[in-house]
Amino acid sequence: MRRALAAAAIGLLLAGPALAAPGKPKPLGPPEQRLTVAQAKAIFLRNEKVSDWLAHYPQRLWQTDATFDQDHKFWRVNVWAGEAGEVATGKVDDTSGAVSEAWTGPQVAWKMARGLPGAFGGKEINSAPVWLGFCALFFLGLADLRRPFSLRNLDLLVLLSFTVSLWFFNRGDIITSVPLAYPPLLYLLGRMAWSGWRGRLGTGAVPVWPIWLLAAATVFAAGFRLGLNVRASNVIDVGYSGVIGANRIANGQSPYGHFPVELGKACGPSDIDGETRERIQTNGRCESANPQGDTYGPVAYEAYLPGYLALGWTGKWDDLPAAHFASIGFDLLCVLGLALVGLRFGGQRLAVTLAFAWVAYPFTQYVSSSNTNDALPPLFLIWGFWLATWPAARGVGAALSGWTKFGSLLVAPLWASYPERRLRPTLVFAVGFLVATLAAFSILLLEPNPVHAARVFWDRTLGWQIDRESPFSIWDWRQYHAGLPDLHILQRVLEVLLIVAALAVYFVPRRKSPLQL
């Protein structure tokens, strides 16, 4: 009996292929989509975040489109509203029917407005324990604990109050985040103007802690910051642009007009949105695109040359060790410069206090953890201030700072008239400024036609930035929906007043103290 069953089983196994032979196997295709176009649109429009934002626009202006991504099984939904353009976009999961992403207003065009976790600086610096730890160290280390309602303590709290704006920024709530940054900015502007006019700060007592304790805290905080940068930070597009610019200079090109773009043959994978950043560039290399990265002054790229020459660049937007090297260097040089400034103008206590203030302030670490070039302008101003009695050094510092990011060019008239408005020191300042400017712009000589290179520089930097729209200030918000004011006229008026004020401080006061400088 057992032999019969075994023989039958073997026969069935052998017969199986023969029985299946007459018909070809039918390939298994991808499963059909579950939702229809209309259903995907309706689900997205019912999302609370989307519906709240769309309420700002007349429904008759809405135009909605939905496309299905077969590979990832989701619907991409886009909504337009007349002249406002695209006002909402997101994803609907086809399997569950849930809205997996919903971006509205400024979040549509600006991914940095979406509040993605750790997008700026990494998750560690943005975590509550680390951030609030820096806040506590900064306040307790510098506060006048004997007088809790002193002006010094108010100044410190205002400096820390930018945390509220950052908290909303990290949630992707730009419409709330941006206005919250203006009250502390206005306070600090008024505070500095009043102190400069009076010639004294009026903050009273020095920190209560002994020098050795502040010095120890400074060393500890500096080491902790270094560890955060090396192990728990990221490099945003600003730091990436510095490395690209250094690469172009080292290879005999001006950075302007030579940044990697998304036009050549793809040489890397596409992301979930179908965007392929890595492309073959005109130099034949596979590089990650950063098409608008050449918008800063020349010093913003030249300062990355040491890091690039030491650590190189793969062509990709990867860990970018050269950017980390530069960012850490900028940070430490600011600390050293502040210590020297304090030592020169106030002795050991002020030296330690200024260094401590930098390493304890959370936003300086935010800059370091994001590996940007934002520490460069203050770096040159700090060292120029240290050498304030030498007009040429002030000129060099003002020029290098201004040709990194153009805003600090406003300090040039003030610095040119220190300690008083006299022709000879002003001329020496101008010579230092001119020499530093020529050195900074010498990279334009790397191009076959320096005049054309200068025009490209203008077009890629100030020419582009003047008309650039951004959601990270209130001036361009009118584009988003009805009810938001058009502030462009006010912006132009304030810009003119700012330039007038920058020129006026060359003349008033006639004699200036280091504090006023």
Locate each region found by the language model.
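Transmembrane helices and adjacent periplasmic/lumenal helix-loop junctions
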Residues: 394-420, 439
